[in-house]
A protein has these predicted regions:
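A short, structured active-site edge motif that brings together acidic residues
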Residues: 73-85, 111-116
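Short alpha-helix boundary/capping motifs
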Residues: 69-70, 78, 127-128
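Active-site mouth loops of central-metabolism enzymes
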Residues: 20-33, 80-91, 119-123
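Generic beta-strand or strand-like secondary-structure segments
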Residues: 61-64, 80, 91-98
């Protein structure tokens, strides 16, 4: 696996693992199959896993797999703020706290804005205090 360093010098695999579409049965992620996929990627050198609040159980699944296999401190997790669900600062804080709970961690490595495509949306988030919250 090839790696690039982030701005803090942390090596990040050039291939990340997107966690949007795990196979499901009866609306639930097929745990054993998806866990094998995550572990195979990790064994191949992948250390960057991308999930999101709206990815249908993905955060909970990833948190469980990393906890069960002792991987949390060995990987980097990116998840996303669903800005379209945010109405105020309390919504930002509540959503982030829920993501931490789902991921079974007290931090995420990279927190992204999900589908932020225009200046108007960014201005709305700024009016809720997102810049101060990020700092």
């Amino acid at each position: 696996m090839q790696y690039r360093n982030d701005k803090y010098g942390n090596p990040i695999s050039v291939l990340g693992f997107g966690c949007m579409r795990f196979d499901k049965k009866g609306g639930k992620i097929e745990f054993e199959k998806a866990e094998k996929e995550i572990l195979a990627a990790y064994e191949a050198g992948v250390n960057y896993y991308d999930t999101a609040y709206i990815y249908g159980g993905s955060e909970e699944f990833l948190g469980e797999v990393f906890e069960k296999n002792g991987l949390r401190d060995k990987v980097k997790i990116a998840t996303k703020l669903p800005h379209y669900l945010i109405k105020n600062m309390e919504g930002i804080e509540k959503t982030f706290a829920e993501e931490l709970r789902r991921l079974r961690t007290d931090y995420v490595d990279y927190y992204l804005m999900h589908m932020l495509t225009d200046v108007k949306t960014w201005e709305r988030l700024k009016s809720h205090g997102i810049e101060e919250w990020i700092r």
